[in-house]
């Protein structure tokens, strides 16, 4: 329960908090000033085996979006990351480590390309929005940067695709890995990506508008009973086993991309710093 926390703009509930509390959440963490469920009635080990066999519904609203749009949106995103985004297609997701002037990792979001001049950065636990605003101002870039009203809901596990295909139709199966499409929820179009913080397969639904969140949760929960659905959260055993690091835990500002990732990175705003780190790593 979140009874021991004083809710404010610094610690925010989500559209799904009432649902996870009713389902027996045993604790929360705070990520990006928002509640993240951390444990339910089952043990971490039992949760691990369930996730590998069935399907779970996760409240990951704490994955806040930093929206960058405008004529210089692409240039600003490229300025922040060593990942070359020039060939990214609309409808594609990219993992894009964000670095500072010394090649230290500031964040490791997933980039969603909504249009040629509009991007979402689905962030880990640091204030990337402020960094983006500072760079845009300092470089004189024409870009609008803000946090949209988006609350991701994750459906993870080997039964996730079957559940979502039953609810939203077979076209769900055509969405490729790290690609996204659109589904109808309560008369609105909502973005759904084949992605998530597990290695068991699944999707993330980026719910635009908090009012649509509870209804979507209830819809998936009812349909999920046939698939042995449970509430869940990122599982420590499963994500480490799958090589999914957590910013703030396994990597921080003190690390550079060459210490964390196997593949090379190129075309950096701070190429001198990266090259220095490459030689030392």
Question: For each of these PLM feature ranges, what is it?
Answer:
Residues 44-53, 98-108, 137-140, 184-192:
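Short amphipathic beta-strand starts and helix->beta connectors
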Residues 1-32, 36-39, 111-281:
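Conserved, structured C-terminal
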Residues 1-96, 104, 232, 261:
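Acidic, proline/glycine-enriched N-terminal capping motif
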Residues 71-107, 160-188:
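Internal amphipathic helical hairpin motif
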């Amino acid at each position: 329960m979140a009874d021991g926390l004083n809710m404010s703009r610094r610690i925010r509930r989500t559209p799904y908090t009432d649902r996870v509390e009713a389902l027996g959440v045993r604790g929360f963490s705070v990520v990006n000033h928002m509640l993240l469920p951390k444990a339910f009635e089952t043990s971490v080990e039992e949760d691990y085996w369930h996730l590998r066999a069935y399907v779970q519904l996760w409240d990951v609203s704490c994955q806040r979006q930093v929206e960058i749009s405008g004529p210089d949106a692409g240039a600003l995103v490229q300025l922040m990351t060593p990942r070359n985004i020039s060939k990214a297609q609309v409808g594609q997701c990219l993992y894009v480590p964000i670095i500072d002037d010394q090649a230290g990792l500031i964040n490791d979001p997933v980039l969603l390309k909504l249009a040629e001049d509009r991007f979402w950065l689905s962030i880990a636990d640091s204030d990337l929005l402020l960094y983006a605003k500072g760079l845009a101002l300092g470089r004189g870039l024409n870009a609008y940067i803000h946090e949209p009203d988006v609350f991701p809901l994750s459906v993870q596990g080997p039964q996730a695709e079957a559940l979502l295909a039953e609810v939203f139709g077979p076209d769900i199966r055509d969405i490729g890995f790290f690609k996204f499409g659109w589904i109808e929820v309560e008369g609105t179009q909502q973005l759904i990506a084949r992605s998530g913080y597990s290695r068991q397969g699944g999707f993330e639904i980026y719910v635009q508008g908090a009012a649509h969140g509870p209804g979507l949760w209830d819809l998936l929960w009812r349909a999920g009973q046939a698939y042995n659905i449970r509430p869940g959260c990122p599982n420590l055993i499963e994500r480490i086993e799958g090589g999914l690091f957590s910013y703030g835990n396994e990597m921080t500002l003190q690390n550079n991309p060459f210490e964390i990732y196997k593949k090379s990175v190129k075309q950096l705003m701070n190429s001198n710093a990266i090259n220095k780190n490459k030689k030392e790593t």
